[in-house]
Curated annotation (Swiss-Prot):
Taxonomic lineage from the root: Bacteria, Bacillati, Bacillota, Clostridia, Eubacteriales
Subcellular location field: Cytoplasm
Organism annotation: Clostridium botulinum (strain Loch Maree / Type A3)
EC number: 5.6.1.7
EC category: isomerase
Disulfide partners: none
Name the UniProt record assigns to this protein: Chaperonin GroEL
One GO CC term, this protein: cytoplasm
GO molecular function: ATP binding; ATP-dependent protein folding chaperone; isomerase activity; unfolded protein binding
Catalytic activity: ATP + H2O + a folded polypeptide = ADP + phosphate + an unfolded polypeptide
Quaternary structure note: Forms a cylinder of 14 subunits composed of two heptameric rings stacked back-to-back. Interacts with the co-chaperonin GroES.
Function: Together with its co-chaperonin GroES, plays an essential role in assisting protein folding. The GroEL-GroES system forms a nano-cage that allows encapsulation of the non-native substrate proteins and provides a physical environment optimized to promote and accelerate protein folding.
Keywords, alphabetical: ATP-binding, Chaperone, Cytoplasm, Isomerase, Nucleotide-binding
Pfam families in the record: Cpn60_TCP1
Amino acid sequence: MAKSLLFGEQARRSMEAGVDKLADTVRVTLGPKGRNVVLDKKFGSPLITNDGVTIAREIELEDPYENMGAQLVKEVATKTNDVAGDGTTTATLLAQAIIREGLKNVTAGANPIQIRTGIRKAVEKAVEEIKVISKPVNGKEDIARVAAISAASEEVGKLIADAMERVGNDGVITVEESKSMGTDLEVVEGMQFDRGYVSAYMVTDTEKMEAVLDDVYILITDKKISNIQEILPILEQIVQQGKKLLIISEDIEGEALSTLVLNKLRGTFTCVGVKAPGFGDRRKEMLQDIAILTGGEVISEELGRDLKDVTIDMLGTADSVKVTKENTTIVNGKGDKVAIKERVSQIRVQIEDTTSEFDKEKLQERLAKLAGGVAVIRVGAATETELKEEKLRIEDALAATKAAVEEGIVPGGGTAYIDIIPKIADLTSDIIDVKLGIDIIRKALEEPVRQIANNAGAEGSVIIEKVKASEAGVGYDALNDKYVDMLKTGIVDPTKVTRSALQNAASIASTFLTTEAAVADIPEKENTPPMAPGMGMDGMY
């Protein structure tokens, strides 16, 4: 395919036009008085959102050079979202500001490579200073503030703080759509996996269609059980003790299933069978997790263990087990606490080592089931459009909260960036163009406050000067149009989000400035086939 080429200033300006189109679409969403953007969907209703990365992902421009610029800034938003989960609008805004200021200097004859050196130097200093002013998150109140600022809702803030308090830092919090109007929180205590009973005849409560077993033995195996003779010796031992049994296996079928159901219906013996969770190697690991949590052993031929030889001390135990049609929950497994801690440490190491996002997510779930718990925030709304928008807000708030717990918090509303400007201004260089790079970052750091003020109907430049003249930590509360101590008022941003937004914006923008040529495909013209004779409708009356 033939290529189209642009060079120098023309290439950079064409790409800058694309950067501006994307950034100008995203920037209107920043701050407590930021607006929403409507995204057209080919199927279903349009999506209304203020989530920077969701908007950026939808933007494709017709002009190939403009589209290149837009895609570069889209990467800023995506990378920030991947690392910190929030701050995508801020990152986009910073990238636009660095590119705009940088191109002015490059056009005036400055060396882009030296400018990039200055930008990197300034960003390193900025990140250091952000860490200096960072404060650790202390308790539920701080968590609620971070979430409330991100979601623009105090109710959501309290909900997320409750969820994090109940499942701990190792717990998993998921956001799902609710069928009702309200937004509520459900916490699953103990270990839950998505496998239900193999036969409805095993239920102990026919109204709720669930089986609840108290003080229960748990047989864990990766084998398929079809012959009752295989498990008869262990069943006899359990019956003698008058206990109940949960069997977790690949499957229970045939004679074994019918015998267990018959004994349950006669009231001789209560047993519930469920299929093992997961598939392949993940199944083996999950069975091992259950065994460690309950103090049992996995009965597997790979480990040289046969069902006929199972003894009581090979079984796991738990205070209670609840089995529904779709889920099994084991509460208060009686496993050895030291063994559980070792297993948790092992999973943490695997999480750090894995490069796959999918594997990381699954390992995190396993960790939560062993160490913390699982909380589900169910989001409800009157319409599907509102529900999608609310769900995106809560997902952002959740990511921001996790980031805050990791690295702490800084004054919000762009105040942290303003507070570190004097430290950036102190940086010097004998090379003029490197100094220009430092100045570019100094100016770009003002941009978030300016945009938050503009979106609130105030004059951005005036607000910036007032914040600069105030004490460190005092910023502009755009919601109430006043100047306050941001940390005391609860207007905070996660340190990780603030840091990542600047680092990712500077990385892409400084590379953009060094562009000297751009290459794009020339779209092929579609050849229209010649019209068949008579198709021109000549001679029609």
